[in-house]
Swiss-Prot record:
Name assigned to this protein: DNA topoisomerase 1
Coiled coil segments of this chain: none
Keyword Zinc-finger annotated: yes
Purpose: Releases the supercoiling and torsional tension of DNA, which is introduced during the DNA replication and transcription, by transiently cleaving and rejoining one strand of the DNA duplex. Introduces a single-strand break via transesterification at a target site in duplex DNA. The scissile phosphodiester is attacked by the catalytic tyrosine of the enzyme, resulting in the formation of a DNA-(5'-phosphotyrosyl)-enzyme intermediate and the expulsion of a 3'-OH DNA strand. The free DNA strand then undergoes passage around the unbroken strand, thus removing DNA supercoils.
Needed co-factor(s): Mg(2+)
Originating species: Rickettsia felis (strain ATCC VR-1525 / URRWXCal2) (Rickettsia azadi)
InterPro entries: Topo_IA, Topo_IA_2, Topo_IA_AS, Topo_IA_cen, Topo_IA_cen_sub1, Topo_IA_cen_sub2, Topo_IA_cen_sub3, Topo_IA_core_domain
PANTHER family: DNA TOPOISOMERASE, DNA TOPOISOMERASE, TYPE IA, CORE
Toprim domain segment(s): 1-111
Gene Ontology molecular functions: DNA binding; DNA topoisomerase type I (single strand cut, ATP-independent) activity; zinc ion binding
UniProt-listed Pfam families: Topoisom_bac, Toprim, Toprim_C_rpt, Zn_ribbon_Top1
Length: 776
C-alpha cells in the first residue's frame, strides 16, 4: 500500500478518485506540530533550538497517520506547493520517523502539483522529489521570528502599557500604516479652490463642456482661484468673450490587459468588485482549489491560490487562445501569446498564476452548480484569465483647445471613445479610490469654428484628506512595501480586528485607541522593528533562505542580538517616562490644537493628562484626589475605572479648516451628539452651530459638508413653474424641503446636502396632493 498524505479531507476526497486501489489518501488536518504558546519554545542560547509539540486536536490524526504509515511501502507527501506545505510535509515525516523508527529518507516521496486534476496528480506521483530543506528552513525561520517577537515584546507591552494585548512582527507594521493614515486625516486642513466650466455650443447646436485653463498666458493651477469673489469676477469677465476652436488634436491610445491573478491582486479585486474580505476570498479560493461538487463529480476548479507568479503554462495558454478564437473571434486574439514576467526570486516557489484548471468550464456552465459566492469568485478568475490573453483596447482620444478672440482666455475640452473594445469585451479592472471614468464624447468640431457660450459655471471645491485604507488598498500598500507575503495578508488583517486594534467602518480601516497606543509605543521605543524598510528586508532574507542563499540560523541570530538588546533597554525605562512620551505623541489626537480642551470639564481648574490603570489608558484630572474626574480613551472598555459619564470622546475639537473669512470650523461632540461650529465662543455670544445628522458618520465630515450644514436653511433654486424659492434645511424630524411655506421630508436615499433642484422639484411634485390637502 502506498500512503498519500494531504492537509484536508476535501483535497483527499478529490485526489483519491484519480489514484488506483494501491493508494490510500488521508488528511493531516493542517499542521500536526507547532511551537506551544509558552516561554522556551525557541531557545536562542541553544542555537535557536525549536521545541515542537503535537497539539491535543492533532493527536488523533497523528495516531492514524502513524498507524497507516506502518503498513505502507512508501509515504507520498502531497501537501501544498509552498513553504507552509513543505513544512507540514517535513513535520509529518519527522513524526513518522520518530514513532515508527524509520531511518531512510527514501521512504518519503514529496509530490507537488499546482492544480488538482487527474493529469497533474498522476504526473506528480510519477515524478516525486525529496523534501526541500531550504523551503522548510525558511518557514521555520519565519515561525521563530514571529515567536521571538510575540513572546518577548507582548509581555513587555502588558507591563508598560496595561490593557494592550499583543504585538507582532508584521501586524504591528500594518497597524502603523493605518494609524499614520488616520494622523494625516486628523491633521489635514481643507483648502478651498475653484475652477471654471464653460458650457459651449457648436455650429450644429450641439453642447459640450470645456474647462478654463489659461488667463493672460498664465496657466490656471489648482489654487489659482481660491475664493468665491475671484471666481465670480472671472465669470463676469468671461461673459463678454467670444470663443472659437483654436486647435484639435486626435490620437489613439492602447490599453493592455492586466496579468492573471496572483494572491494579492485577487484579494484586491475581490474586495473592490465583490466586497469580499481577504479572509473570505482565501477561504473560497481554497475550496475551489481543493475540489467542489459540480454534480456527478468533485473537481478542483482553480490552480493553487497562494502564489506570486504571473506565468501560465503553455498548455493553459493554448487552451485560452483556442477559446478566445472560438467564442469571440480572431480579431480579439493577438498574433502571439502574451507572456508575463514573474517577480518571484526563488524559482522553486514560482508557481503559476491563479487560473481555472479547465478554461472550458465557463461561469455560465457552472452557475447552477456552485454556491453564489463560489460562482462570483470563479467568474472573476475566469474572466481575468481570458482577458489577459486578449487584444488591447483601442481608445480614440480628442483634445479640443478653445480660445477667446485675442487669446486672453484659453480652455480645453477632452473626449474619448472606445474604437475597439478588445479585452473589455470580457473584463475591466476596478480602481481603488477613484471615480469611474466616463466615456465622454465630443461632438464634431472644426478648427476656427466659432462657438456660443451657453453657460459659465464657477465650481467650488475643497481639498480632501487621503482616504482611509480599504482591505484592497492596504493589501496593495503592504505589497508595494514588500511587507508580508500573499499567504499572510488575510491573517494580518484578521488579527488586527480580532485584537480590537482596528475596526472596519464603511469597509475602511479605522484605528481604535488601543491600536494607536500600541503604535505610538512601538514607534517610540522599537522604531527600527516597525520601520517599513526593515520589515521588508526581513522578508527578503526569508526569500534568500528559501532559495538556499542564506543560512537560516545566522539570519535569526542577526535579528535576535539587536532585538533582545532593545527589549532589555526598554525594560529599564520607568513607566512614567513611557507615559510622558505616549501622551506627547498623542497630544494632537487627544486634545487637537485647542488648549482649552485639556481643561478638566468637572473642576474647571485642573488639566487632563494620560494615566495608565490595570484596565488600560485613561485621562485624569491633575487636581486628584480633590477632583476624581477620569475619562477612558479606549472605546468599549467595560472594565475601566471610570465614572459613569466618561464615554470615549477623544479629539472633541477637531479643526476641519476655515471659511472664506478665515474663521475656523470645528467638529465637536456635545451631550446630544456631534455638531459643527463656526469659530469660538466669545463672552455670551454663542457661535453658529449645526448638528451632524444621524445619517452621517462624524468621522466622514469634511469642511465642505460642515460649511453646507452651517449655511442651512439654504436656498437651492427657484421652482421653474411657480417662481417660488426652494429651500433645504435640517430640523428635529430630519432633513426637509421648504416650499411655499410648507415642509416636505427628504427620504434617506437622497444626499440632502447635495440635493439637486430637479430632485427637489420631483419631491414637491410627488407630495403635491399632500401639500394641497394641508393648504385646504
Amino acid at each position: 500500500m502506498k500512503l498519500v498524505i494531504v492537509e484536508s479531507p476535501a483535497k483527499a476526497k478529490t485526489i483519491n478518485k484519480y489514484l488506483g486501489d494501491e493508494f490510500k489518501v488521508i488528511a493531516s488536518f493542517g499542521h500536526i506540530r507547532d511551537l506551544p504558546s509558552k516561554k522556551g519554545s525557541v531557545l536562542p542560547d541553544e542555537n535557536f533550538a525549536m521545541k515542537y509539540d503535537i497539539s491535543d486536536k492533532a493527536g488523533k490524526y497523528v495516531d492514524a497517520i502513524v498507524k497507516d504509515a506502518k503498513k505502507a511501502d512508501a509515504v507520498y507527501l502531497a501537501t501544498d506547493p509552498d513553504r507552509e506545505g513543505e513544512a507540514i510535509s517535513w513535520h509529518v515525516a519527522e513524526v513518522i520517523k520518530e514513532k515508527n523508527k524509520v531511518k531512510s529518507d527514501d521512504f518519503f516521496k514529496r509530490v507537488a502539483f499546482n492544480e488538482i486534476t487527474k493529469k497533474a496528480i498522476i504526473h506528480a506521483v510519477e515524478n516525486p522529489r525529496k523534501l526541500d530543506a531550504n523551503l522548510v528552513n525558511a518557514q521555520q525561520a519565519r515561525r521563530a521570528l514571529d515567536y521571538l517577537v510575540g513572546f518577548t515584546l507582548s509581555p513587555l507591552l502588558w507591563r508598560k502599557l496595561p490593557g494592550c494585548k499583543s504585538a507582532g512582527r508584521v501586524q504591528s507594521v500594518a497597524l502603523r500604516l493605518i494609524c499614520e493614515r488616520e494622523d494625516e486625516i486628523e491633521r489635514f486642513k481643507s483648502e478651498e479652490y475653484w475652477d471654471i466650466s464653460l458650457k459651449m455650443q457648436n455650429s450644429n447646436n450641439e453642447l459640450f463642456t470645456a474647462k478654463l485653463t489659461h488667463v493672460n498666458d498664465q496657466k490656471l493651477e489648482k489654487f489659482s482661484i481660491i475664493n468665491e469673489k475671484d471666481a465670480k469676477d472671472l465669470t463676469e469677465k468671461l461673459k463678454s468673450q467670444n470663443f472659437h476652436v483654436d486647435k484639435i488634436e486626435k490620437k489613439q491610445q492602447k490599453r493592455q490587459p492586466q496579468p492573471p491573478f496572483i494572491t494579492s491582486s485577487l484579494q484586491q479585486e475581490a474586495a473592490r468588485k465583490l466586497g469580499f474580505s481577504a479572509k473570505k476570498t482565501m477561504q473560497i479560493a481554497q475550496k475551489l482549489y481543493e475540489g467542489v461538487d459540480i454534480g456527478k463529480e468533485t473537481i478542483g476548479l482553480i490552480t493553487y491560490m497562494r502564489t506570486d507568479g504571473v506565468t501560465l503554462s503553455n498548455d493553459a495558454i493554448a487552451d485560452i487562445r483556442k477559446l478566445i478564437d472560438k467564442n469571440y473571434g480572431d480579431k480579439y486574439l493577438p498574433n502571439s501569446p502574451r507572456i508575463y514576467k514573474s517577480k518571484v526570486k526563488n524559482a522553486q516557489e514560482a508557481h503559476e498564476a491563479i487560473r481555472p484548471t479547465n478554461i472550458t468550464y465557463t461561469p455560465d456552465s457552472l452557475k447552477e452548480k456552485l454556491e453564489k459566492d463560489y460562482y462570483k469568485l470563479y467568474e472573476l478568475i475566469w474572466k481575468r484569465t481570458i482577458a489577459c490573453q486578449m487584444e488591447n483596447v483601442i481608445m480614440d482620444l480628442v483634445v479640443a483647445s478653445l480660445a477667446s478672440e485675442n487669446k486672453e482666455y484659453l480652455a480645453k475640452a477632452n473626449g474619448s471613445t472606445i474604437a475597439f473594445d478588445g479585452f473589455y469585451k470580457v473584463y475591466r479592472e476596478s480602481v481603488d479610490d477613484e471615480a469611474e471614468e466616463e466615456n465622454k464624447m465630443l461632438p464634431p468640431l472644426k478648427e476656427q469654428e466659432p462657438l456660443k457660450t451657453k453657460e459659465i459655471i464657477p465650481n467650488q471645491h475643497f481639498t480632501e484628506p487621503p482616504p482611509r485604507y480599504s482591505e484592497a488598498s492596504l493589501v496593495k500598500k503592504l505589497e508595494e512595501l514588500g511587507i508580508g507575503r500573499p499567504s499572510t495578508y488575510a491573517s494580518i488583517l484578521s488579527v488586527l480586528q480580532d485584537r480590537k486594534y482596528v475596526s472596519l467602518e464603511k469597509k475602511r480601516f479605522m484605528p481604535e485607541e488601543l491600536g494607536r497606543l500600541v503604535t505610538v509605543f512601538l514607534v517610540g521605543f522599537f522604531k527600527k522593528y516597525v520601520e517599513y524598510d526593515f520589515t521588508a528586508g526581513l522578508e527578503n532574507e526569508l526569500d534568500e533562505i528559501a532559495a538556499g542563499k542564506l543560512e537560516w540560523k545566522a539570519a535569526l541570530n542577526n535579528f535576535w542580538s539587536g532585538f533582545n538588546h532593545n527589549i532589555e533597554s526598554v525594560n529599564e525605562q520607568k513607566i512614567t517616562e513611557i507615559i510622558s512620551y505616549v501622551q506627547k505623541a498623542l497630544d494632537y489626537h487627544l486634545f487637537s490644537e485647542n488648549k482649552e480642551s485639556k481643561a478638566c470639564p468637572s473642576c474647571k481648574t485642573g488639566e487632563l493628562s494620560l494615566k495608565l490603570g490595570k484596565f488600560g489608558a485613561f485621562l485624569a484630572c491633575s487636581n486628584y484626589p480633590e477632583c476624581t474626574f477620569r475619562k477612558s480613551i479606549v472605546s468599549g472598555n467595560d472594565n475601566n475605572e471610570n465614572d459613569g459619564d466618561l464615554a470615549a470622546t477623544p479629539n472633541e475639537n477637531k479643526v476641519l479648516g476655515t471659511d472664506k473669512d478665515g474663521i475656523e470650523i470645528y467638529l465637536k461632540k456635545g451631550p446630544y451628539g456631534p455638531y459643527v461650529q463656526l469659530g469660538e465662543q466669545e463672552g455670551k455670544v454663542k457661535p453658529k452651530r449645526s448638528p451632524v445628522p444621524a445619517s452621517l458618520n462624524q468621522n466622514d465630515i469634511t469642511l465642505e459638508m460642515a460649511l453646507k450644514l452651517l449655511s442651512l436653511p439654504l436656498k437651492i433654486g427657484i421652482h421653474k413653474d411657480s417662481g417660488e424659492e426652494i429651500m433645504i434645511g435640517y430640523g428635529k424630524f430630519g432633513p426637509y424641503i421648504k416650499y411655499m411655506g410648507k415642509f416636505i421630508s427628504i427620504p434617506k436615499k437622497y444626499d440632502f446636502l447635495n440635493l439637486s433642484l430637479d430632485d427637489a422639484m420631483k419631491l414637491i411634485e410627488d407630495n403635491k396632493a399632500k401639500l394641497e390637502k394641508k393648504q385646504a
